[in-house]
Structure formats: structure tokens, C-alpha cells
Amino acid sequence: MRCPTTWRGCARSSWAAAPPTSRRGPPGRVPARSGARPVGVDFPERRLATARAMQAEFGIDFPLLLGRAEEVPCGDDTFGPAISEYGASLWCDPHRWIPEAARVLVPGGLLVFMRYSPLFALCAPPGGRASTTLLRGQFGLGRLEWGERTEFVLPHGGMLRLLRSHGFVVEDLIEVQAPRPAHRDYAEVSADWAHEWPSEEIWKARLAG
């Protein structure tokens, strides 16, 4: 299924592999109920099957497309905002998915994405929990091999230059601090660590035009 041209300029879009398995509901739940026209894009098919099941559970319906963030099955200037919550922004090469985001966004469109922070990437061992020791150098940080998976975390300077090179203007960078008390620890980072240093961050960048 490809993105019909009738979706051009839609008010809200859940784009590029925003995880459909979150128990908060499908990524487009809130915009869909506010009258906007979200579109979900994810890969592989089993993740879309999970998203469809959650659409049924929450009583909403919007298009779900099978596709990769590096090659979104939609035309140029299709979406208003585009969102990636630990999908494209973590598991895809930013030198490929960011130019694709620029292609599918309308001029003035907003890109919002969440990812691991560079500091977390510097302090996290393969298969272990982030510590207070720097385990790798920041220069050259980008592609991280974690055994059976690969993730991408550019330093702040590299990400800023990449976004600017594709016409984006960064509006905000939110470094997320874990609350205290936190509701839980995670396998890759403790709540205490994430309270002292950001393990996650949210970027907001607008396409010029």
C-alpha cells in the first residue's frame, strides 16, 4: 500500500517506525481522536499486525503502511509533522533517514524524534547497564554494534550539522531527566543514573521554507 496523494499536507503524522507496541496505544492515537489524519509507517509486517490489533483495542483507525524510514512509500511534501520514537531515530542510519524525512515533509513541517543521548552511548557496555565510566571515545561516535543489533547515535555536533545540511532548523533539544522516585529501572540504565545524566533526548527541528 502506498501513500495516496490525498494525504498531502495532513495535519499530523506518525512516521517512520514509531513503535506500535507501546501500551499507551498506537502512535497516532491522540491526533486521530483530535480530528487529524495520522499515518503510521513501520517494518516488518509483524509490527504492523501488532499496531492493527491495538487500533482495534483502542477503537481508532488510520492507515498503516509497510515501509522503511530510508524509503518511505509516500510522495514528496506529504506530511506536516513527522514523529519517530525510538524507531528510525535509533535503528536507521541518520544519513539516510533524515534526508528522507526532509523529502516527505512539507516546507515548514516539523520533525520530532527521540533517541539515546550521546552520553548514554559513551557509558553503556554491550548488553549491560550504563555506568559512570566512559567506555568509548566521542569522536567517531555513530554506529554502535550491540551483538545482534545495530544502533546509531551521532554526537550533538554531528546531528546538528546533518539536520542543517538537509534544510532543518533545530527548535529545541530536550534532555530527559528521570523523575524521583521513578516508576522502574531499565535493563540498559538505572533510574538513578537517568536522574543524574540524560539517557534520552528529544529533538525538534523544522524544515525551512
Residue map of PLM features:
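A short glycine-rich, Lys/Arg-flanked "PGG" loop and its adjoining helix->strand segment in the class I
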Residues: 95-110
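Short alpha-helix
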Residues: 150-173
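Conserved alpha-helix/loop element of class I SAM-dependent methyltransferases that forms part
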Residues: 1-11
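Class I SAM-dependent methyltransferase SAM/SAH-binding core
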Residues: 11-71
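A short acidic, Gly/Pro-enriched loop at the edge of an enzyme's catalytic core
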Residues: 70-81
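Core SAM-dependent methyltransferase catalytic element
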Residues: 166-168, 186-209
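Conserved class I S-adenosyl-L-methionine
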Residues: 110-142
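A short SAM/SAH-binding and catalytic strip from SAM-dependent methyltransferases
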Residues: 80-95
